[in-house]
């Protein structure tokens, strides 16, 4: 038997027993500070949410140790029988949530889900038609700085200037002129429901594959508060966080078996190696939660809260893009107030309200400045906020923007910050975490 004096620390117990606070107090302090920030601030970033403790536990589990290249039952490594269970649970729950035949839960992000679809059905130089970033689309839909705008001939459609809704006449004209191999719907800053049927008709007319990126509204679809794009599209991609309220990750869905096989090969071995099994376990937990009746109530409240906040912003004298929202997010045009999105974001954060500066349709300002902000209701709704709280939030936003426009927002920021702290104290998250 080995002399205990020479037993490595990993076998002596320290490696498996010493926690983060002792092992790395500097990092532990930063995590604790972030927990405190999340507790005391109102989160309005539309792409963020708050996961359950169960999701946290799954994502922080020992599944992080396991490599599992391949798919359940067809792995390239041994010892995968239990991680196979986790992935199979995630797949079956995703299929049930979205009423579809096939799901790939391995993409590490929404961007990689889109990249996987491109790898599966396109070749470099093919033409894609997607919503421009300026109109509310996403980088991966053909924006020039993104790989999708470099590898493909990316044509971009936008919104109508009079109402900021998708310009389907333009979509149809561009589709017929360019004959794209793929048409993409969905975006990161479009607050209205999308006519998927109209998009599919245009795609069929030109022989294009129709892809819907539902990263922002997938949770609304899962809970029945938004039309299901899989009733019309060939392929849907999504993140697994945002309104779906799971860990950060991606997913690809389809009803076409031939496409599903191509997608699986495109993800592995096409663009990824071993999947993140601890994250896939977190996805499985979140999908299980989304199948519960309470999730339907949650997403209905998300939409109602977003509408209440948008209406309160209008009442406060702010210009709401498209005059409202059908989803979880709203865009505020600050040009009539003479305030930039960058300044509004900073002032709101000083008041403990977190949002993001965002371009608006036909924005004259650069993306580092912007003329608007994007606000969303998912995280606040998870905390328990209802219409009353979101009306108050919209009022606070209006007060701070007005104070900025008048040249000095310090006093208003200080007052709102204390009021926000009082509100968040009534709706705590993660008892025992943060201060």
Curated annotation (Swiss-Prot):
Cofactor: pyridoxal 5'-phosphate
Binding site residues for (6S)-5,6,7,8-tetrahydrofolate: 133, 137-139
Listed GO MF terms: glycine hydroxymethyltransferase activity; pyridoxal phosphate binding
One record GO biological process: glycine biosynthetic process from serine
N6-(pyridoxal phosphate)lysine: modified positions: 242
Residues carrying the site annotation Plays an important role in substrate specificity: 241
Keyword Cytoplasm listed: yes
Listed EC numbers: 2.1.2.1
A single GO cellular-component term on record: cytosol
Superkingdom of the source species: Bacteria
Keyword Metal-binding attached: no
UniProt xrefs under InterPro entries: PyrdxlP-dep_Trfase, PyrdxlP-dep_Trfase_major, PyrdxlP-dep_Trfase_small, Ser_HO-MeTrfase, Ser_HO-MeTrfase-like, Ser_HO-MeTrfase_PLP_BS, SHMT-like_dom
Reactions mediated catalytically: (6R)-5,10-methylene-5,6,7,8-tetrahydrofolate + glycine + H2O = (6S)-5,6,7,8-tetrahydrofolate + L-serine
Pathway(s) per entry: One-carbon metabolism; tetrahydrofolate interconversion; Amino-acid biosynthesis; glycine biosynthesis; glycine from L-serine: step 1/1
Catalytic EC class: transferase
Subcellular location(s) per record: Cytoplasm
Cross-referenced PROSITE patterns: SHMT (PS00096)
Pfam families: SHMT
Predominant place of localization: cytoplasm
SUPFAM superfamilies xref list: PLP-dependent transferases
Keyword entries, A-Z: Amino-acid biosynthesis, Cytoplasm, One-carbon metabolism, Pyridoxal phosphate, Transferase
Function: Catalyzes the reversible interconversion of serine and glycine with tetrahydrofolate (THF) serving as the one-carbon carrier. This reaction serves as the major source of one-carbon groups required for the biosynthesis of purines, thymidylate, methionine, and other important biomolecules. Also exhibits THF-independent aldolase activity toward beta-hydroxyamino acids, producing glycine and aldehydes, via a retro-aldol mechanism.
Family label: Belongs to the SHMT family.
Subunit relationships: Homodimer.
Protein name: Serine hydroxymethyltransferase
Record gene name: glyA
């Amino acid at each position: 038997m080995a002399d205990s004096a020479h037993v490595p620390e990993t076998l002596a117990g320290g490696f498996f027993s010493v926690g983060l606070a002792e092992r790395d107090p500097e990092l532990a302090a930063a995590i604790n500070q972030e927990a405190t920030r999340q507790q005391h601030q109102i989160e309005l970033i539309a792409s963020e949410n708050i996961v359950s403790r169960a999701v946290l536990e799954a994502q922080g589990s020992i599944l992080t140790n396991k490599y599992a290249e391949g798919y359940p039952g067809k792995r390239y490594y041994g010892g995968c029988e239990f991680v196979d269970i986790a992935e199979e649970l995630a797949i079956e729950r995703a299929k049930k949530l979205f009423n579809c035949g096939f799901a790939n839960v391995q993409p590490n992000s929404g961007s990689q889900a889109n990249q996987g679809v491109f790898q599966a059905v396109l070749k470099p130089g093919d033409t894609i038609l997607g919503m421009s970033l300026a109109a509310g689309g996403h980088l991966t839909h053909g924006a020039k700085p993104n790989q999708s705008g470099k590898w493909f001939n990316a044509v971009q459609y936008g919104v109508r200037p009079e109402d900021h809704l998708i310009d389907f006449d333009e979509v149809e004209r561009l589709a017929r002129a360019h004959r794209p191999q793929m048409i993409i719907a969905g975006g990161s800053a479009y607050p209205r429901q999308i006519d998927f049927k109209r998009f599919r008709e245009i795609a069929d007319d030109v022989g294009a594959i129709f892809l819907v990126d539902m990263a922002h509204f997938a949770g609304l679809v899962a809970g029945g508060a938004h039309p299901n794009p899989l009733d019309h599209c060939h392929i849907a991609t999504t993140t697994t966080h945002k309104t779906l309220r799971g860990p950060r990750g991606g997913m690809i869905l389809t009803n076409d078996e031939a496409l599903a096989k191509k997608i699986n090969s495109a993800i592995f071995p096409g663009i990824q190696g071993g999947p993140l099994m601890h994250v896939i376990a977190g996805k499985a937990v979140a999908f299980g939660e989304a199948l519960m009746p309470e999730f339907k109530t949650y997403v209905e409240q998300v939409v109602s809260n977003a509408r209440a906040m948008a209406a309160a912003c209008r009442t406060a004298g702010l210009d709401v893009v498209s005059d409202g929202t059908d989803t979880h997010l709203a865009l505020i045009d600050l040009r009539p107030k003479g305030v930039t999105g960058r300044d509004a974001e900073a002032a709101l954060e000083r008041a403990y309200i977190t949002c993001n500066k965002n371009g608006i349709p036909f924005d004259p300002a650069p993306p580092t400045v912007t003329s608007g902000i994007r606000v969303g209701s998912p995280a606040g709704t998870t905390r328990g906020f209802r219409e009353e709280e979101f009306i108050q939030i919209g009022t606070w936003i209006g007060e701070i923007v007005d104070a900025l426009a008048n040249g000095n927002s310090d006093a208003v920021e200080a007052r709102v910050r204390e009021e926000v702290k009082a509100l968040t104290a009534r709706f705590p998250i993660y008892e025992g975490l943060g201060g």
